[in-house]
């Protein structure tokens, strides 16, 4: 099993490999020293903190909310007329297939940036466009969930996306995005130090 420690684990930028003991020596030999340099103690400490938080009940609630938010966003996008690869999502990610529209992934990414929504262009299976243009956009829900967004908020995000890629008025959509972010500030109640126990 391979994974990153950033993204859904919300830790430092790194990765890890889990394997059975019988494969450990081969994995270690393949990774170090050729692919991995010396250990960075601050990154090791950050990983330890990330794994400690991931073992908590609160983190499980966070992960469940990520999934619920992903379903809400996927539903809103599809209800707004956008096509999703695989017809929805079964994790925290989804990819909008723009081939039936006039949008390229790049143009959609730029348009959504105008209404303060960050996505990234992505190729879709059998994409005829080059990767820098692409025919899709990829979205995920961990960051907004960490910020406190719930299913209702993600339905609004879906409406903002479909509006921006449709006939929506950009100034009005931008104002709605601002209102949503004001409702869910980045660091509500932050006192200048973390509280992990």
List the predicted regions and their residue ranges.
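Active-site C-terminal subdomain of aminotransferase-like
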Residues: 2-103
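Conserved PLP-binding catalytic core of the aspartate aminotransferase-like
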Residues: 83-148, 194-197
């Amino acid at each position: 099993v391979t994974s990153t420690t950033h993204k859904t684990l919300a830790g430092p930028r790194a990765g890890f490999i889990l394997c059975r003991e019988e494969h450990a020596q081969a994995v270690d030999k393949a990774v170090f020293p050729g692919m991995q340099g010396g250990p960075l103690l601050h990154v090791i400490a950050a990983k330890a903190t990330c794994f400690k938080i991931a073992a908590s009940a609160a983190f499980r609630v966070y992960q469940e909310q990520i999934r619920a938010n992903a379903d809400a966003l996927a539903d809103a996008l599809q209800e707004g007329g956008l096509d999703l690869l695989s017809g929805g999502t079964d994790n925290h990610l989804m990819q909008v297939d723009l081939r039936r529209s006039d949008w390229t992934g790049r143009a959609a990414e730029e348009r959504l940036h105008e209404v303060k929504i960050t996505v990234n262009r992505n190729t879709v299976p059998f994409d005829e466009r080059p990767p820098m243009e692409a025919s899709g956009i990829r979205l995920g829900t961990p960051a907004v969930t960490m910020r406190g967004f719930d299913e209702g908020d993600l339905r609004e995000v879906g409406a903002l996306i479909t509006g921006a890629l449709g006939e929506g008025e950009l100034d009005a959509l931008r104002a709605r995005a601002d209102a949503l972010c004001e409702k869910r500030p980045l660091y509500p109640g932050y006192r200048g130090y973390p509280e992990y126990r």
